[in-house]
Amino acid sequence: MDGYHLPRAQLAAMPDPATAIYRRGAEFTFDGEGFYRLVQRLRERLTAASPTVFAPSFDHAIKDPVPDDVAISPGSRVIILEGLYLSLNREPWSSAAALMDESWFVGVDREIARARLVKRHVTSGIVPDTAAAEHRILSTDFLNADDIVKNRLPVQEMVPGNWRELSQDRLD
């Protein structure tokens, strides 16, 4: 779903560009309609003449989506879609979710998420230090997470975000 981030130029053209750029990752900074159209295309009946479907990717080096970068061949029978808003009970995300065979939700403990986000924000250069990362997490990431949890559609499976540790505990 990262390919459906709105390009930085589009965020800069919004009525409040500073907020749009700072909040990148919030629902309103994604092309939800474009994602919905992708899911619709993926649900079309396959025939011998069905074309390859292309989806955008996200290039972290240029910090923008790359159109038509991911090829999904008509022979693909299982397609896994991943992203923050895929189970959000708000249009167009809820319409896209209705077209999916199953929806799974990975729940991550808030402290584990915070630690991972601090590391990611500092390592990727989004912020200069841990204090700035903590501020960004509270003013963007956790707002997004709270919105998703509060407005999530029912899902078929809840996956714990620490499943690796849980799996390892069972092996020991």
From Swiss-Prot:
Q: Protein name, please?
A: ATP-dependent kinase-like protein notR'
The protein's job, in short, is: ATP-dependent kinase-like protein; part of the gene cluster that mediates the biosynthesis of notoamide, a fungal indole alkaloid that belongs to a family of natural products containing a characteristic bicyclo[2.2.2]diazaoctane core. The first step of notoamide biosynthesis involves coupling of L-proline and L-tryptophan by the bimodular NRPS notE', to produce cyclo-L-tryptophan-L-proline called brevianamide F.
Record's SUPFAM superfamilies? Answer: P-loop containing nucleoside triphosphate hydrolases (SSF52540)
Family recorded in the similarity comment: Belongs to the YFH7 family.
Q: Which organism is it from?
A: Aspergillus versicolor
Q: How is it used?
A: Notoamides have been shown to exhibit antitumoral activities. Notoamides A-C show moderate cytotoxicity against HeLa and L1210 cells with IC(50) values in the range of 22-52 mg/ml, but the IC(50) value of notoamide D is greater than 100 mg/ml. Moreover, notoamide C induces G2/M-cell cycle arrest at a concentration of 6.3 mg/ml.
Q: Name one GO molecular function term.
A: ATP binding
Q: Does the keyword ATP-binding apply?
A: yes
* UniProt keyword list: ATP-binding, Kinase, Nucleotide-binding, Transferase
Q: Which PANTHER family match?
A: URIDINE KINASE
ATP-binding: present as a keyword of the record? yes
| E.C. code | 2.7.1.-
Q: Which residues form a coiled coil?
A: none
Q: Which InterPro entries match?
A: P-loop_NTPase
